[in-house]
Design a protein with these regions (language model features):
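Acidic/His-rich structured neighborhood in mature extracellular/periplasmic domains
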Residues: 1-11, 16-19, 27
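Short aromatic loop motif centered on NTY/YTY
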Residues: 10-11, 31-107, 116, 128-131
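Short catalytic/ligand-binding loop motif for oxyanion handling, primarily in non-cytosolic enzymes
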Residues: 14-15, 87-88, 122-123
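Charge-rich, low-complexity intrinsically disordered segments
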Residues: 115-141
Length: 141
């Protein structure tokens, strides 16, 4: 049975949500359905899962922007790691935003896995003071 992966976006008034979702295609008589057991992930930032999730959600403040995209060089989905602006605002998604670190979601052994704190920034001893941060992301995207 074929399973596809969808990167989706749902805007909201106080927080936006980006999804990584599995789509299973049924036979001709069945319709496709969203959500699939293709994730071998027990946590994503502050979200903890009792069971393997059918989809992964990235929720963050609607005035900010967060990256969730496929990168050919790293062979996976690279996403901004999201964290609350203050420790007391854990799980209040309107207070979440990128914290300048990255996570990588990659395909291994028939499931999507996650590697938190994935090192994208290369060869830096001191952080640059301008916007020219050298990362290993594909510059064409």
């Amino acid at each position: 049975q074929k399973v596809y992966t969808l990167l989706a976006f749902r805007p909201g008034p106080s927080y936006h949500t980006k999804y990584v979702d599995g789509i299973e295609l049924g036979s001709r008589s069945e319709r496709c359905h969203f959500g699939s057991r293709i994730f071998n992930i027990r946590s994503n930032g502050d979200e903890r899962y009792a069971r393997r999730p059918y989809r992964i959600q990235f929720r963050y403040n609607s005035t900010l922007s967060a990256a969730v995209r496929w990168d050919n060089k790293h062979k996976g989905i690279i996403c901004d790691h999201l964290a609350p602006s203050k420790l007391e605002l854990v799980e209040r998604w309107f207070a979440y935003g990128p914290d300048f670190s990255y996570d990588k979601i990659y395909w291994s052994k028939g499931k999507w896995q996650i590697e938190e704190s994935y090192p994208l920034i290369q060869n830096l001893d001191i952080a640059p003071t301008n916007s020219r941060v050298p990362t290993s992301l594909d510059p064409k995207r």
